[in-house]
Amino acid sequence: MKELLQKKLSDSAAARWTALLAVSFTMMCGYFFTDVMSPLEPMLTSNDVNGLGWTSDEYGFFSGAYGYFNVFLLLLFFGGIILDKFGIRFTGLASTLLMFGGALIKWWAVSNTFDGSVTLPFGIGTYHTQVLWASLGFAIYGAGCEIAGITVTKIIAKWFTGHELALAMGFQVALARIGTACALALALPFAKACGGVHAAVGLGAALLCISVVAFLVYCVMDKKEDASAEAVQTEPEEGFKFSDLKMLISNRGFWYMATLCLMFYAGVFPFLKFATKLMVFKYGVDENMAGLIPAMLPFGTIFLTPLFGYVYDKFGKGATLMIIGSALLTIVHIIFVLPITSYIIAIAAMIALGVAFGLVPSAMWPSVPKIIPMKLLGSAYAMIFYIQNIGLALVPIWIGKVNQANTLANGSIDYTETMTIFAAFGAIAVIISLLLFFENKKKGYGLEEPNIQ
């Protein structure tokens, strides 16, 4: 009995998987809201009774708003420092409330009509007032969602290090992809059935309210975990110091990981935001069904990410998995560049992209704790997510302007230039993943070694 009392709560499989389920549900709701507007682009740019009359440029500006505060106000970077300094419970609760608040602003914006437009400085562009209000809400939500993301990632590392770390992270990603897939597949028909864009956004906001409650449940478990860890700890852990950030900044492996994250995700998430229209204009898919093809990507990762995570836990080869996934991403986008208009090819390419999207995250996120110590993990994930958000903020703006420039007289879009850009992101990701592979050989991070001890 004494031996049992001296175990941490996280040593119980039931306890750690229950904790994982609570925080994964929170992020699943978040990912639903993140992409709930992606399949609605045809309605957003329509001038009919349920449309909002946005331009492609305005939609690109709005899509990029997710990362504006994270990138330009450094909120994500400071969020990582707050996480390491003040802990998981404080940071997680604050970030989930920020998500809900931003979602309410966005819902209010698309539920009302606004007169006039505003010209932004530095030649950014002129946008309708409604677009700016919706973008503000999305930016606030994005700051909360990214901070919640690094918090949840550190939570998983805290509870699963020495156990099924990659499988657990894969499970969390799988639930997140369920959220994304549901948004891509259901948002457009739900909005049409319920009278407009505001209905789908309102549904997402309601789910975020429930997600706050789910995180409160986790907070109770986290407090018990800390108490059990103190009971078995033989000597106090060294706390976070600002001077420790030098160790992070000078780590070449960390920078390879961060750059890989930037390039890989720049080739996936911004692509998803424009993929519905791609299916309509290039592959001739019916507008009501077009969102289902991009939805195949997250649905595929629901099964593949935990599977590849299990492979990493059991057999290792994390760096190799990242190389294969990056190469597959590049091949898929090259296929989308080619003058092939068969929707069957589009479906096959999207399935292959789903495999790539399962390979890289399943190996990348569990590899960070092998490179960075636990006391700096929040800051490390924050910096990686911050760099990722540069892509999430700027790439949609770039792609929106490229699509606007390639809009033909009949209103259709030539996607050749757009998909060439995405293919270039994939090619750079391949190069970076190879550099990480050789850096691991040199420094002995253990990226090719199994996670289960």
Predicted regions: what they are:
Residues 37-41, 251-305, 395-396:
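Extracytoplasmic gate region of multi-pass secondary transporters
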